[in-house]
Swiss-Prot record:
Coiled coil: none annotated. Belongs to the cucumovirus capsid protein family. Residues 12-22 have a biased composition (Basic residues). Gene3D superfamilies: Cucumovirus coat protein, subunit A. The keyword Acetylation applies. The keyword Acetylation applies. This is Capsid protein. One of its GO terms (cellular component) is viral nucleocapsid.
Length: 218
């Protein structure tokens, strides 16, 4: 007896028949996943080779030590002639300097280049005698004595330099917040005149946590 015409056989053959478009849909999904992976890889490569102008904060780039936080100040160097220097002492907010005995562990400088940046600058931070007037002669000597790290930051035709950070470790010096007024950020414009709207410096001072006022302002 031929069972091919039975109801059960008809249902089986119907179940085995593939749905229209199922193979093409799965193929499209696989292609989309592969394209997504390629785009993610390309974005990661571009992020390394062509950094954006908005660099991460201290907290975003490196975690603070346990029990520490950081205070940021912004410096905008003025116009600096070719071969000349700029120096500015660190000035933290009063809400921080009120706790002048809190320990400072590190100072980080982040260079944020503005669209007009096309120069080469040397940047450092170091302890400066209170008697120093931060003259060109005094700053020149400080760059050459090797007592603090120096970041050389320059324009590149393919994009701005990826390494935009200088980290100065003060742990062994037992520095505190009160000592920060003795430190200065120094900038040297090497190849040409640095215009006042070419770079912004973000200075992050990592220090022990300070109490937070819970009183509303009057």
């Amino acid at each position: 007896m031929d069972k091919s015409g039975s109801p059960n056989a008809s249902r089986t053959s119907r179940r085995r028949r593939p749905r229209r478009g199922s193979r093409s849909a799965s193929g499209a999904d696989a292609g989309l996943r592969a394209l997504t992976q390629q785009m993610l890889k390309l974005n990661k490569t571009l992020a390394i080779g062509r950094p954006t102008l908005n660099h991460p904060t201290f907290a975003g780039s490196e975690s603070c030590k346990p029990g520490y936080t950081f205070t940021s100040i912004t410096l905008k160097p003025p116009e600096i002639e070719k071969g000349s220097y700029f120096g500015r002492r660190l000035s933290l907010p009063d809400s921080v300097t009120d706790y002048d005995k809190k320990q400072v562990s590190r100072i980080q400088i982040r260079i944020n280049p503005l669209p007009k940046f096309d120069s080469t600058v040397w940047v450092t931070v170091r302890k400066v005698p209170s008697s120093s007037d931060l003259s060109v002669a005094a700053i020149t000597a400080m760059f050459g004595d090797g007592k603090s790290p120096v970041l050389v930051y320059q324009y590149a035709a393919s994009g701005v330099q990826a390494n935009n950070k200088l980290l100065y470790n003060l742990s062994e010096m037992r520095a505190d917040i009160g000592d920060m007024r003795k430190y200065a950020v120094l900038v040297y414009s090497k190849d040409d005149k640095l215009e006042k709207d070419e770079i912004v410096l973000h200075v992050d001072v990592e220090h022990q946590r300070i109490p937070i006022s819970r009183m509303l302002p009057t």
